[in-house]
Amino acid sequence: MKKISVVIPMYCEEEVADICYKRVVSNLKKLSDRYSYELIFINDGSKDDTLDILKKIASNDDNVKIISFSRNFGHQAAVIAGIRNVTGDAVIIMDADLQDPPELFEGMIEKWENGYDVVYGKRKTRSGESLFKLLTARMFYNTLNKLSEIEIPKDTGDFRLVDRKVIDVIATLPEHNK
């Protein structure tokens, strides 16, 4: 049976940690006839009760692993720590705030099973964001795509599914190339 790993970085997410866990597991259990799963939560030096909540969750679910940083190292460091510790055939990376809906997992996995090595979750709208945020996001993606040999779809964020072979390559890159 293939395994799906879900990497979820958290920084001061005590308000949503349990809700996030329940929604993610609920959607993974719908696929349990075809896939096993693991959840890797990365506590990025939270100053609230995020770590205690994660420990309680992990004590009741053997599919949950926790990586905890001594201080806040940043979102990307947390993601990299997570992907370096996955054991799955595919990895879903998502934010804990549930702007990336776990209800899309099944469709992402279906695309992966059809041969895609990377499946992006793209936002339909950027509702609730300021004009400044919208403009800087547009500038970021335009600049990134001019500098990159590979086009990065706009408004994708970190919500994606990545095949194991891609994860293995990413994990070998030196820090400054990630």
What name fits each language-model region?
Residues K3-S5, E38:
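Cell-envelope/extracellular polymer assembly enzymes that use nucleotide-activated donors
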Residues E13-K30:
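Short, well-formed alpha-helical segments that are part of the catalytic scaffolds
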Residues E15-D18, D48-I57:
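Acidic helix N-cap motif at the loop->helix transition within catalytic regions
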Residues D33-S46, I67-S68:
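Short beta-strand/loop segment that forms part of the nucleotide-sugar
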Residues N43-L51, L98-Q99:
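A conserved acidic beta->alpha catalytic loop
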Residues F69, M94-A96:
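Catalytic metal- and UDP-sugar-binding loop of GT-A-like glycosyltransferases, i.e.
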Residues F69-R71, H75-N85, P101-K178:
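Acceptor/aglycone-binding surface of glycosyltransferases and processive sugar-polymer synthases
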Residues V91:
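Short aromatic/hydrophobic "clamp" motif used to bind/position activated sugar donors
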